[in-house]
Amino acid sequence: MTVESTAAPAKVNLMGLSQAKLEAFFDSLGEKRFRATQVLKWIHQMGVTDFEQMTNISKPLRDKLSQVAEAVAPEVVNQWDSSDGTRKFLIRVGGGNAVETVYIPDGDRGTLCVSSQVGCSLDCSFCATGKQGFNRDLTAAEIIGQVWQAAKSFNQFGVGAQRKITNVVMMGMGEPLLNFDNVVDSMNLMMHDNCYGLSKRRVTLSTSGVVPALDKLGEYTDACLAISLHAPNNALRNELVPINKKYPIEMLLASAKRYIDGLPDVRRKMTIEYTLIDQVNDRPEHAHELAELLKDIPVKINLIPFNPFNLSNYKRVSNNALRRFQQILIDAGYTTTVRTTRGDDIDAACGQLAGQVNDRTKRSQRYKIDKNALDASNADIIPVKLVDEADVSITFNG
């Protein structure tokens, strides 16, 4: 006797669908494509996820949508407010996992730091996220859902609402370019006029240097770029950012320059992020070496004092060493800022995000990249093999 499953098919989550994908969804329902614009505005501008409240959509279509689709953001399970106004959200993403999202106010500017993965496989030595191991990529709905939940928290939805989130940075948990498609779709929703409408100069992707993905990035988006550098030479960067052993500094900076060369003149400059660690990379010779390294590249430099966390023996840079390092770069002609530590009393400062990572089946201390894939200039999939032989893939869907 054969028992047939009576389980209903899974509903399509519209939260993370781009305009093109949402139009294709309505095509599949035999509906007009303009419905995609209506639904995007309801979800991302009005904060409405209940189809019954989407009043400019006919009742029969609302009923149909309720049967086959949903609009669901991941759930905020905890929230902490810092004495300096920083707000950290703990967001559940399933499987007992959670990621952290941080809002940082600064005058009339409010920056949201968004996560792209549950944990991270890159294991940068100064970052708490890497110590948690790696579980999986976030879906586009889980990435843009962080923005949606933060906007809801600040009552940003609706006509005439004050915009509190003025900038978004992909600098939370995970390496964005190892979750290429979902990150690109999410960033494009952030900048879409029918969604959050952020200027392209107000959305920034930060990468430790997955060069094959960075080489493809300009085909899919033109957001701003930040390079998580942290060292002026390969020997030191190999220790701090292990992916440098596969994509050394020269290869990374060449790829980054190709990307910014494709941007409009007004945005043709990248940010170099440099975490200063006491007695590790904070000496005057490091500053001089960094100035020489970047001399032919349009950059601004953001110095980040190391923020201590459990499991790390590194120490915060001294104020004297920080000021000396900054002055050397300024004297060399670089715009050089210091990132003010915000939210450290709630473990929300840069490098402190850890979330909750369960089932670390893809945890890695180091990984290997298939050289044959790197040599294939037109490869669509570049497999990344972790030491435990679990696989992660960078996939480009054109």
Curated annotation (Swiss-Prot):
Pfam families according to UniProt: Radical_SAM, RlmN_N
Residue sites binding S-adenosyl-L-methionine per the record: G174, E175, S206, S228, L229, H230, N307
Keyword Repeat: no
Cystine connections: C113-C350
EC number(s) given by UniProt: 2.1.1.192
Catalytic activity: adenosine(2503) in 23S rRNA + 2 reduced [2Fe-2S]-[ferredoxin] + 2 S-adenosyl-L-methionine = 2-methyladenosine(2503) in 23S rRNA + 5'-deoxyadenosine + L-methionine + 2 oxidized [2Fe-2S]-[ferredoxin] + S-adenosyl-L-homocysteine; adenosine(37) in tRNA + 2 reduced [2Fe-2S]-[ferredoxin] + 2 S-adenosyl-L-methionine = 2-methyladenosine(37) in tRNA + 5'-deoxyadenosine + L-methionine + 2 oxidized [2Fe-2S]-[ferredoxin] + S-adenosyl-L-homocysteine
Domain Radical SAM core: 106-345
Residues given in the record as [4Fe-4S] cluster binding sites: C120, C124, C127
Cofactor, free-text remark: Binds 1 [4Fe-4S] cluster. The cluster is coordinated with 3 cysteines and an exchangeable S-adenosyl-L-methionine.
GO cellular component terms given for this protein: cytoplasm
Compartments in which it is found: Cytoplasm
GO term, biological process aspect, one: rRNA base methylation
Enzyme superclass (EC): transferase
Keyword Repressor: no
Keywords, alphabetical: 4Fe-4S, Cytoplasm, Disulfide bond, Iron, Iron-sulfur, Metal-binding, Methyltransferase, rRNA processing, S-adenosyl-L-methionine, Transferase, tRNA processing
Recorded GO MF terms: 4 iron, 4 sulfur cluster binding; metal ion binding; rRNA (adenine(2503)-C2-)-methyltransferase activity; rRNA binding; tRNA (adenine(37)-C2)-methyltransferase activity; tRNA binding
Additional observations: Reaction proceeds by a ping-pong mechanism involving intermediate methylation of a conserved cysteine residue.
NCBIfam families, per the entry: rRNA_mod_RlmN
The protein's role, per its UniProt record: Specifically methylates position 2 of adenine 2503 in 23S rRNA and position 2 of adenine 37 in tRNAs. m2A2503 modification seems to play a crucial role in the proofreading step occurring at the peptidyl transferase center and thus would serve to optimize ribosomal fidelity.
Family from the record: Belongs to the radical SAM superfamily. RlmN family.
Protein name (record): Dual-specificity RNA methyltransferase RlmN
Organism annotation: Saccharophagus degradans (strain 2-40 / ATCC 43961 / DSM 17024)
Gene: rlmN
